[in-house]
Design a protein with these regions (language model features):
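N-terminal export signals
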Residues: 1-11
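A glycine-/small-polar-enriched, mobile loop at the entrance of the PLP active site in fold-type I
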Residues: 28-66
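Conserved PLP-enzyme active-site core in the AAT-like
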Residues: 14-37, 41, 68-82, 87-212
Length: 212
């Protein structure tokens, strides 16, 4: 019977990780920001800030307001909000488009029978995160052809298809940002905004850098 190799001093000194205690194998994350892989690894400064935040209690609404200012300054956006992940961000963005500043509508969600509740979306953009949009009470309306998705052609979404789908029940347009779709974004925004329709851009993996 072979003798077990002696442990080195380094191996003995290295503490067991939380994942080892739970029996969860670690992965090599080559995707970066994907929530389902745990998101990005935290920088030491972030870990320190999280540890400091855990030592006190604050009013979360006040914290969100302060965080919004920091996010806006870092990204160039008008405002920002901290969420638990990409799906939560889509749900909150959809809820904002459904309710706006109407407190009664906010209280009614996800019951959207008395308000515009349809979210337009290119058929080629449909994906598993659609559930996050419907969670807020929205109904997704497919528009356009699925030529690219089926490999039957190269035709993409056109402005007239968006205009034909907009009616009094429309609340927003959802655009999924990928290297293959970004070229259509200016047209989508111009067409939707012309009809007073906000555009939700799912760009969960586009930041950083700030230029995006």
């Amino acid at each position: 019977m072979a003798a077990r190799a002696p442990k080195t001093a380094l191996a003995e000194a290295k503490p067991e990780t939380i994942y080892q205690r739970l029996g969860v194998p670690q992965r090599i994350n080559a995707a970066g920001t994907l929530t389902r892989l745990g998101g990005s690894l935290m920088a030491p400064e972030v870990l320190l800030a999280m540890a400091q935040a855990a030592e006190a209690s604050v009013d979360i609404s006040e914290l969100q307001s302060a965080a919004s200012r920091v996010i806006a300054a870092c990204t160039g956006a008008q405002a920002g909000i901290v969420t638990s992940g990409a799906a939560a961000g889509l749900t909150l963005a959809t809820a904002a488009c459904l309710a706006g500043w109407d407190v009664l509508r906010m209280a009614a969600l996800p019951d959207t029978r008395a308000m515009p509740h349809r979210v337009l979306m290119a058929r080629t953009h449909r994906n598993s995160y659609d559930h996050a949009v419907r969670l807020a009470g929205a109904e997704i309306v497919d528009i356009g052809h699925n030529d690219r998705g089926t490999g039957a052609g190269v035709r993409g979404l056109e402005a007239w298809e968006i205009e034909a789908a907009i009616d009094a029940r429309s609340a927003a347009f959802l655009f999924v940002a990928t290297p293959d779709t970004l070229a259509d974004l200016p047209m989508v925004m111009a067409t939707a905004h012309q009809h007073g329709l906000p555009v939700i851009v799912d760009a969960a993996a586009q930041l950083p850098p700030r230029s995006n």
